[in-house]
Amino acid sequence: MFIVLTFFHLWPVGLYPAFPLKISCMPELTYHIFLLVKRLWRAKDTGRLESVVGPYKLFDSSLRTLQGSRWLSDEVIDAYLHRVIERRKNAVHLLCSVVASSLFSGQFRCLTKMKFPVEDMWLCPVNFGTHWILVIVNISAQKILLIDPMGNEGVYDRKILHNWRNFLRMRGHEDTMEWQLQTMQHNNQQDSSSCGVLLLKFAEHYLAFGERSVKY
């Protein structure tokens, strides 16, 4: 999972100064930071707050999901995408993974007081069970782009579009049938654990290059 922390600026809460953690580039990784990461991965979960990235908090257990072939936590997903958007200065709204997963699962009760974002594009990391998929909403074009790292978009497409239309109706939007869902060509996940990492790279590629074939 080293790729996840590339250019990911973590802000430690304890005695450590702010630093850019670039684990994918080992020559640039200082020995001090290397020891810090290794010590964190070996330790037991304590619930300690380790880093703050924008509005997102990363705990020791969050960063431990970066180790080996573990599934990425929602805090890591949200924090990384926040940095991607912030770094590129795209006019994009990040719908945090908890809210996005509730919305596209049709669980609207917790969304009644949600403030409708002003940005035209929404980046939505969605977790169904133990699998991450990426939904990108284009408000003005009335289009949804669905990317499943496994390449099984057909499993989710009707559910995603149906729940999005229902969400809009709940918010008072009447002309929801104009909305369409699209997919795009991309390479597929080859294992059982890298869906979160691929979601992050797909999102980063899309923001950089638009609707071209996504490859990793």
Model-identified regions with their sequence ranges:
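Cysteine protease catalytic domains with a Cys-His-Asp triad
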Residues: 1-133, 137-144, 149, 153
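Cysteine protease-like catalytic core of ubiquitin/ubiquitin-like
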Residues: 97-216
